[in-house]
Structures are given as structure tokens and as C-alpha cells.
């Protein structure tokens, strides 16, 4: 869990965040239910901040900032409901609600952890999602990132995502310094993301 330090960015990108972090959340949820504590694991540096990484890595038109081996399609992430449950920050679910409104039934059918949203999100009010306050977010770590946007509720908003770091992290590419620019609903510049493993 040290890879989330210090600010919550995940070095392998947003898709591998979903895969790896979902196992962390399931484990922490299980031991907390069984023993009444997670033994401080959720308090490790950066871990409770990593939900903000996913929140800010999604563009106004619900695309991912795809660097390393990651694709550009945003996805429903049930683990974000775990972060809501732990932090009680309703704004962390903003993009999740937008994704569900767009084509939620299809997304839920394809997600093995969708039932966990019912448990972790039981107290969430999803009818009117709380808009996040911060228009920018940055994180240090193995692959530092920075995300900026002009608005949360305007699909024509300007959005910029930037990635620094190292190509030697797991699933890394030679993409240090890559960026994504979205404005007026158009992706003007982006990292092409990952290729198929078998090519």
C-alpha cells in the first residue's frame, strides 16, 4: 500500500488502480467487519486520498486520462463507494453518479463488484450528487500527476491532465511528460494509452 503515498496517485494509472485498489477495499472491509478494526491500514499515507485521484482523472466528458497501460474509457468503480463510506465525502461520487446516469445498467452488469456499492454506498444520496469544490488536484509519488478543469458541471469545460514520473514503474510506458487536453467536448491532445498485450 506504500505506492499510494504521499498524496494518493497510483503509479500504474487509473485502470490498474481499479483492479488493485478493489482488492484492498474488499480486504479492509472484511477485516473491519470481522475484527472491528482495519488495524490502521486505511490510514497509511495517501490511501484515503486516492479516491480523489480517480475523481480528478476523469474528464468533463467522462473519459480517463489514459497513461501507461490504461484505456480512455471511464468506468464505474464500486471501490469509490468504499472511499465515500470511509471519508463521508459525497463529492467523491460525483463522476460515478454521472457514469451511472449515462449508461449505468450496462456498466453494472459488467462489474464484478457492483453489489458492494449497495453496502458501501448505503448512506449515500445519489439523486443530487455533491459537486466537488476543487478544480485542480496534484499528487507526488512514483508517477506524479496534476489535473485541472474549468468546471465540474459543464461538458464544454477545459480540462488538462499531466503525468510525470518514470517509465520503469509497473505497466509504465515512455510517456513521462504526457498530457491530455479536453475543451469544448473534444480531446485535443492525449496519450494513446496501452496496447493489447498480445500484439
Predicted feature residues:
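Carbohydrate-active enzyme catalytic cores, enriched for enzymes
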Residues: 16-189
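Flexible, active-site-adjacent loop/turn segments at secondary-structure boundaries
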Residues: 8, 65, 195
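Short, electropositive, low-hydrophobicity segments enriched in small/polar residues
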Residues: 12, 17, 197
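Acidic/His metal-coordination segments adjacent to aromatic residues that form catalytic metal sites
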Residues: 1-12
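C-terminal, non-catalytic macromolecule-binding modules
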Residues: 189-199
Amino acid at each position: 500500500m506504500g505506492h499510494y503515498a504521499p498524496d494518493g496517485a497510483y503509479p500504474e494509472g487509473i485502470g490498474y488502480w481499479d483492479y488493485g485498489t478493489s482488492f484492498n477495499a474488499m480486504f479492509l472491509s472484511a477485516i473491519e467487519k470481522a475484527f472491528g478494526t482495519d488495524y490502521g491500514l486505511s490510514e497509511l499515507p495517501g490511501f484515503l486520498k486516492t479516491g480523489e485521484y480517480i475523481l480528478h482523472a476523469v474528464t468533463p466528458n467522462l473519459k480517463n486520462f489514459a497513461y501507461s497501460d490504461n484505456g480512455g474509457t471511464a468506468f464505474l468503480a464500486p471501490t469509490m463507494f468504499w472511499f465515500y463510506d470511509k471519508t463521508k465525502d459525497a463529492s467523491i461520487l460525483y463522476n460515478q453518479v454521472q457514469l451511472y446516469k449515462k449508461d449505468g445498467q450496462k456498466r453494472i452488469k459488467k462489474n464484478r463488484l457492483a453489489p458492494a456499492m449497495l453496502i458501501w454506498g448505503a448512506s449515500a444520496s445519489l439523486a443530487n450528487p455533491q459537486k466537488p469544490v476543487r478544480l485542480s488536484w496534484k499528487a507526488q509519488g512514483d508517477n506524479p500527476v496534476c489535473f485541472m478543469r474549468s468546471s465540474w458541471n459543464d461538458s464544454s469545460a477545459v480540462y488538462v491532465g499531466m503525468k510525470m514520473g518514470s517509465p520503469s514503474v509497473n505497466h509504465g510506458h515512455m510517456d513521462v511528460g504526457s498530457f491530455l487536453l479536453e475543451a469544448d467536448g473534444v480531446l485535443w491532445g492525449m496519450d494513446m494509452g496501452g496496447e493489447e498485450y498480445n500484439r
